[in-house]
Amino acid sequence: MRVLELTQENKKNVLDELIKRSPNHYGEYEAIVADIVENIKENGDKALFEYTAKFDKFELNADNIRVTEAEIEEAYASISPEYIEVMKEAFQNIKAYHEMQVRNSWFSTKPDGSILGQRITPIAKVGVYVPGGKAAYPSSTLMNIVPALVAGCERIVMVTPPNSEGKVNAGTLAAAKIAGVKEIYKCGGAQAIASLAYGTESVPKVDKIVGPGNIFVALAKRAVYGYVSIDSIAGPSEILILADETANPRFVAADLLSQCEHDEMASGILITTSKELADKVVKEVDGFVAAAPRKAILEKSLSNYGYILVANSMEDAIEAANDIASEHLEIITKNPFETMTKIKNAGAIFLGEYSSEPLGDYFAGPNHVLPTNGTAKFFSPLSVDDFIKKSSVINFSYDALKAVHEKIELFAEKEGLYAHANSIKVRFENE
């Protein structure tokens, strides 16, 4: 890891490098994805089956594309009872947390008798993308399904790629069963996203698509955005730890590596006011990496985006943290709650030395689908809000409209919209 002193002179250059870490040039991939999306749109199942044979090495057809109930039960039975119980408890925690986010419709009656309000309705059809292979995480299955479930979406469809034998990851299917989702289709990649967006003979069209994936999935979501809603275009995982001299260096090192092991583009950043802590964390990181099963990935991610910044004050450290706007922010200081009050930008905030980031990944309840690459400045974690729609409601009586009709007519005429004005005038033309 690189240890740098964070000064007023170098702050801009250092932070620019950290914030702009993800590549923005995907030209060759964009062309491939555009072709896939258009082919699915035009040819439906035929194109989907061809892509599955090409990329997943499995001969998909209309008879085997949907995961059967027997396949779900077989997968569920193959998972250890201990793991099933952990997933069930995690599901309940996630569900309870998201139930606190539920919004209700509201109506307000004004003194003139007019009624204004907001009606909340769930998005009807949602598609959840779940990666396969080494990136198949049952926790992500739960995190993407539960807020849609709590919102009341009437149809939740899941897509996930099969292996060459037509099998789907057992943990993914077990998590889906626990969450109550039974409509699951064996398809992945950009072709699965396009199938959900436009519909095929076998895969239903949905209104919103959520879920993580590789660059092809991300670009496909971007390509269909506007035709359907999407959650976000997620980048590589990232963690930022704010710590003072009271922090345990071994805890800090372990937490940094918890995100760096995801992939070579993941970032782990410590901002501290203690040079002594910084030096100790470096030693602890080296020790953990040497014995880590994912040593090669850790070494690469730390080489690319592993930083320890030593700030002159906690105020400077907090300012830098707000500029970076990390996906995960741990605060390990003498008074973490006080420090948190000064944080403006972060996807999820973990307070104190016993609130390690994996709590949020798996078990605590808040969603682990979080804004990345600085987008926590304007985006939020996946929530029930992502699966609802808000409709404004207006009800005016004759008397209520009569009291204001001339003002509305004036406004419309000043904007040159005379049919707008007439829509009001016609109601009082005989008076």
Regions found by a protein language model. Name each.
Residues 323-431:
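C-terminal core of ALDH-fold dehydrogenases
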Residues 180-258, 262-267:
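Conserved NAD(P)+-binding/catalytic subdomain of aldehyde/semialdehyde dehydrogenases
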Residues 154-163, 268-274, 352:
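Short internal beta-strands
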Residues 262, 270-346:
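A glycine- and small/hydrophobic-rich beta-loop-beta segment
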Residues 1-124:
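N-terminal Rossmann-like NAD(P)+-binding subdomain of aldehyde/semialdehyde dehydrogenases
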Residues 108-174:
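Conserved small-residue-rich beta-alpha loop and adjacent elements
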Residues 103-108, 266-271, 291-302, 332, ...:
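Flexible, glycine/charged-enriched surface loops at secondary-structure junctions
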